[in-house]
């Protein structure tokens, strides 16, 4: 089976990709989105989102990285897709699933689910602009406020010439509510298409991964939030390994505080470590205790000292 690390805006940046791919067995990472509006973006934008471009589009441990674009105008999606791959990205992905109100308000992400023709035009333009040996992929949800158009959306992706499709098993309106996950609908899409379909949503451990694959028939999954709850989740999902012990999680957090974020104003680790602990608290009681001990700290140096001082 293949396990992909999902794009999570504001969460899974290059530093976290470096940490997670070092202790996992991911087949591919997708970057946070590059927002495309009405221009060909400067090279520095791609390097900021995906510094792995300087290293053959791979993380330090060797996992391939693919740039994701977010936008609605086929011409500019195409030009920026061409630039991304010319810079070395291992293919390019189109975001048609982000449920953020800000993103949707500007006509991007899940808003495209309302107009499958626009998905078709965007993906087709990207496919034409990218060398044929490189993948052009698309990530969608089941629909905007219902799944009534899921086949129309999936057909648009395949007819555009996309290499594969990632389907998050909820509509935009359903957000991330666990009770709404619909792996069966992903399976219906998989049966309809001839291109590979990758299942996404509520894959949080070995059992849920097995259930998802059995229900959907997919042999590849993409994991997002769960990868932060359990830092070695790809190995749990692939090999039924136990979750990472807390002392190893601490070691990972300690390494995180030592990594330098380019352009950091001093607040990067403050926000990101507190955010990560919020995910870890779902699996590790010790993370709750650590969060309480640092929640009042507002300087990176203070948080780094507190985490480095943990005895493991």
From Swiss-Prot:
It is an enzyme of class 1 (oxidoreductase). PROSITE patterns: UPF0034. The active site is at residue 98. It catalyses: 5,6-dihydrouridine(16) in tRNA + NADP(+) = uridine(16) in tRNA + NADPH + H(+); 5,6-dihydrouridine(16) in tRNA + NAD(+) = uridine(16) in tRNA + NADH + H(+). It holds the Pfam family Dus. Catalyzes the synthesis of 5,6-dihydrouridine (D), a modified base found in the D-loop of most tRNAs, via the reduction of the C5-C6 double bond in target uridines. Specifically modifies U16 in tRNAs. Belongs to the Dus family. DusC subfamily. This is tRNA-dihydrouridine(16) synthase. It comes from Salmonella typhimurium (strain LT2 / SGSC1412 / ATCC 700720). The gene is dusC.
